[in-house]
């Protein structure tokens, strides 16, 4: 059962957001004359690993698992889970309560909640009033579904044509399900997935977005023998968090003692973030502009050399993100000094090598990555070799005798001789030829 819950739009810093949420939850409980006793904590979402390390959480699970756990906890019949969050869209397709397939948008922000939120703010309307404004429109422009960049351009064009802000907002809500089902998941025939749809994620607080999704899904069942059963998760904004909590409960029931730092400590986390050229990573060609978050917390976190997972072998699930200067490596000095007693958290890196500052530590990470590459085949590399593999067809006749050749035969011979001098390239984009 969900006793209390807290939800807010992200302010851009997961640590600050978490401190606000924890304070809100505690206040709700204490207003009822009760006291919280935390037996387990789970995290999920993009900042799950960061928050897990800072809070001492017991579980950090991926969003697809968290949302599936949450839906199955509240509803017996689930065929499709559609999570529309602030940054992405996730579709989980189930069979007998087991996930058999899922779709994610990892490259484009089309149709996500933040796009609707930012558009609403550009019009000077709080996102909480989005649906009220959109439902007040008597007509709406027809947006083409697809890339968010093109949709932003469409907004400008429609404004020039005289469309009102509420009409544009209605049009954006109306195109949302097309982005979900036709652009991201590319599943036009929804009826083949099943009949029970659960809508989750913070965007489902926007009733204009919900209505457009319901209308679209129902339209895909017209003329079919079955009808769609569409449910908005009763805790849609917190559905992922509930799934993470379910995993924490499971660990507690199996005898796991929580490592959570405590409510008071979590509200008093002191940190300082730095983003500058001094934090830029040069360990690969990406040259990521990283952010260093120096955190002061009371609960113990071992020094990096004792907890640096890539030194323990290639089977570790992920590298620990907290970094502190090794006592044995006093010769290394960071460009951004680390205050005594603080632990450094490095974010904004696109690969594992950017988790550290010292080149020697980076080499240790690379050893672990190389070990993984040696232990597992690189299918992208194999495909690149196979697609350009020389093809030798069977010989079906004897060679052409050396006699007087016609013009066509001479041309063919010339082409055959020049074949080894010709290179043909096939473009590759996102590992697809």
Regions found by a protein language model. Give the residues of each.
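N-terminal glycine/serine-rich phosphate-binding loop of ATP-dependent small-molecule kinases
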Residues: 1-61, 215-232, 252-270, 274-277, ...
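Glycine-rich phosphate-binding loops at beta-strand->alpha-helix junctions
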Residues: 44-47, 175, 188-220, 234-237, ...
């Amino acid at each position: 059962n969900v006793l209390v819950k807290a939800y807010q739009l992200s302010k851009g810093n997961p640590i600050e957001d978490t401190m606000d949420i924890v304070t809100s939850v505690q206040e709700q409980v204490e207003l009822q004359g009760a006291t919280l006793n935390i037996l387990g904590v789970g995290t999920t979402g993009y900042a799950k690993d960061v928050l897990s390390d800072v809070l001492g959480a017991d579980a950090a699970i991926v969003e697809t698992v968290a949302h599936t756990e949450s839906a199955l906890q509240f509803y017996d019949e689930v065929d499709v889970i559609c999570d529309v969050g602030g940054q992405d869209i996730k579709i989980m397709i189930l069979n007998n309560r087991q996930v058999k397939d899922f779709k994610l948008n990892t490259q484009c922000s089309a149709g996500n909640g933040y796009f609707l939120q930012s558009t609403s703010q550009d019009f000077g309307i709080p996102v909480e009033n989005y649906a009220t404004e959109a439902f007040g429109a008597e007509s709406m422009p027809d947006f083409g579904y697809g890339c968010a960049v093109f949709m932003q351009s469409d907004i400008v064009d429609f404004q020039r044509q005289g469309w009102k802000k509420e009409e544009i907002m209605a049009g954006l809500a109306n195109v949302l399900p097309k982005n979900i089902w036709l652009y991201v998941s590319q599943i036009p025939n929804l009826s083949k997935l099943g009949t029970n749809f659960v809508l989750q994620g913070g965007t489902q607080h926007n009733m204009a977005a919900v209505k457009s999704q319901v209308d679209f899904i129902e339209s895909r069942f017209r003329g079919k023998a079955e009808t769609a059963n569409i449910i908005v998760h009763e805790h849609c904004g917190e559905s992922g968090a509930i799934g993470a909590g379910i995993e924490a409960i499971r660990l507690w029931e199996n005898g796991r003692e929580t490592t959570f730092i405590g409510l008071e400590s979590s509200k008093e986390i002191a940190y300082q973030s730095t983003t500058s050229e001094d934090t830029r990573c040069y360990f690969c060609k990406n040259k990521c502009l990283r952010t260093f978050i120096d955190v002061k917390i009371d609960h113990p976190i071992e020094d990096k050399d004792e907890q640096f997972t890539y030194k323990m072998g290639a089977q570790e699930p992920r590298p620990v993100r907290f970094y502190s200067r090794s006592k044995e490596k006093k010769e290394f000095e960071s460009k951004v000094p680390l205050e005594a007693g603080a632990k450094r958290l490095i974010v904004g890196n696109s690969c594992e090598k950017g988790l550290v500052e010292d080149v020697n530590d980076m080499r240790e990470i690379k050893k672990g990555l190389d070990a993984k590459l040696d232990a597992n085949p690189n299918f992208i590399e194999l495909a690149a070799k196979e697609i350009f593999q020389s093809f030798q067809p069977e010989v079906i006749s004897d060679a052409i005798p050396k006699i007087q050749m016609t013009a066509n035969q001479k041309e063919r011979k010339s082409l055959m001789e020049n074949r080894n001098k010709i290179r043909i390239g096939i473009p590759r984009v996102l590992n697809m030829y």
